[in-house]
Amino acid sequence: MDPPSLLSLALLLLAAAAAAAFVLFPRRRSPEKKPSSGNPGSLSELIKNGHRILDWMVEILAASPTNTVATYMGVVTANPANVEHMLKTKFENYPKGDRFVTLLEDFLGRGIFNSDGDHWKLQRKTASLEFNTKTIRTFVMENVRVSVVDRLIPIFARAAASGETIDLQETLERFAFDNVCKVSFNEDTGRLSGDDTMEGREFARAFEQASELIVGRYKHPFLLSWKLMRFFNIGDERRLKEKIATVHRFATSVIRRRKSAASLGDDLLSRFIAEADYPDEFLRDIIISFVLAGRDTTSATLTWFFWLASTRPEVLARVEAEVNAVRRKNGTCAGVMFTLEEVREMDFLHAALSEALRLYPPVPLQTRACHESDEFPDGTKVRPGTTVMYNSYAMGRMKSIWGEDYAEFRPERWLDKGGGFQPRSPFRFPVFHAGPRMCLGKEMAYIQMKAVAASVVERFEVVVMDKEKVREKDYTMILRVKGGLPVRLKEKSVAAG
């Protein structure tokens, strides 16, 4: 595009932004009064604290008597009663909303994580039946076994032998991507092993880039700006279109091969195909949604877990003791993959991972749109069209929810007097959502994380470089460790047993 056209577009964007500001801001502000400069929810404060948005929101929510504030982003809450109201009591009044759906629709279509109403109910019902079968759990465990025993552990063993420093986060991300693709549509993308095909490599790279670019839309304060860029096919929107085309092409190819196959497998795509004659686009949206949901969530949690545990060596010692106790009880040796039943016996490890999730939830903020006028249990009045957010990151740091030691990494808070895992209300710990939209993959996520963590802790000492250093947060679509997590691995003698 030539310079005059770019200048015209820039002026058009500015005009559109000004017009949108006039229309949109009144709909998002508090129904009682507009946040003014100097108030915690004001636009100036938001801009000033943009580099530390999550921790700033913790501060203003903790300072609010109801743990709820009105900002230029909408109404934000860390109040469990309000969360239950949104996600359960008045579930139908708080859909994802058109703004959220529109932002992600090019990438996710109307998949289960990007739809409301009857379309969502159909996918949810079908997916719920599949996730609760013994067959899918067995399939997940077998894939974890192959990925851990045949790929992840050998990589760690080579790193231990050479003494090299590796980025634990990056390695776990490659592991997680391979695993979620295998479970979703039974394709080996080979990211961890390096045996990826050209098609698989292009898909993986395009998926990662599309995920990052789609998040960029959230940085545009007004819908019109990125929509105009998409209309003119320029900048990030042009790149996004190209990456989405690559992802969709790969997914459609897999779907058509699977439909024409003589027999179907136990992966999620095969089970959906066996369920009914769904259109290719419907299936594509579903599997892309599942890959997005599982791609970085488990790897991010495991990364945060290993960093947090490095600050409390006694936690890792207790995890190792629990793993050894499970081995003795079941008569299995180190190096043999744990069974599903063995993984479920690891209550302290379950608690330690839950504690990492409390402090560093993969998705810190979740948004909803108010459909009809409403009032939260804490008295906050919400207008139709208002963006409403519940802040899982802040809720994990509320003294009112977790007590005086809320800032500490203390897995023991999740155990009962007998040492068994004690779940908390999902409205106090909404990391896996709650109500009708409760995450279907919750058990699957815990199974994978526990299997990986137990296998690594049993065989290696994970030495985090600069473990005393406070890790910065990288928050795009998932809350990750900024710059990765450099570690060195030392193989334990027990590994040979």
Curated annotation (Swiss-Prot):
Location, primary (coarse class): membrane
GO cellular component: membrane
EC number: 1.14.14.-
Record localization: Membrane
Membrane topology listed for this record: Single-pass membrane protein
PROSITE patterns: CYTOCHROME_P450 (PS00086)
Free-text biotechnology note from the record: The coexpression of CYP90G4 and CYP94D108 in the yeast strain RH6829, which was engineered to accumulate cholesterol, leads to the production of diosgenin, the main precursor for the industrial production of steroid hormones.
Enzyme class (EC, first level): oxidoreductase
Alphabetized GO MF terms: heme binding; iron ion binding; monooxygenase activity; oxidoreductase activity, acting on paired donors, with incorporation or reduction of molecular oxygen
Keywords annotated in UniProt: Cholesterol metabolism, Heme, Iron, Lipid biosynthesis, Lipid metabolism, Membrane, Metal-binding, Monooxygenase, Oxidoreductase, Steroid biosynthesis, Steroid metabolism, Sterol metabolism, Transmembrane, Transmembrane helix
Expression sites (tissue/organ): Mainly expressed in roots and, at low levels, in leaves, fruits and stems.
Pathway: Steroid metabolism; cholesterol metabolism
GO biological process: cholesterol metabolic process; saponin biosynthetic process; steroid biosynthetic process
Top-level taxonomic group: Eukaryota
Binding site for heme: 439
InterPro entries the record matches: Cyt_P450 (IPR001128), Cyt_P450_CS (IPR017972), Cyt_P450_E_grp-I (IPR002401), Cyt_P450_sf (IPR036396)
Transmembrane domains' residue ranges: 6-26
Family per similarity comment: Belongs to the cytochrome P450 family.
Primary role: Involved in the biosynthesis of spiroketal steroid and saponin natural products from cholesterol such as diosgenin and analogs (e.g. furostanol and spirostanol), plant defense compounds used as main precursors for the industrial production of steroid hormones. During the 5,6-spiroketalization of cholesterol, may catalyze the 27-monohydroxylation of furostanol-type steroid to an intermediate product that undergoes a stereospecific formation of the terminal heterocycle to yield diosgenin.
Protein name: Cytochrome P450 CYP94D108
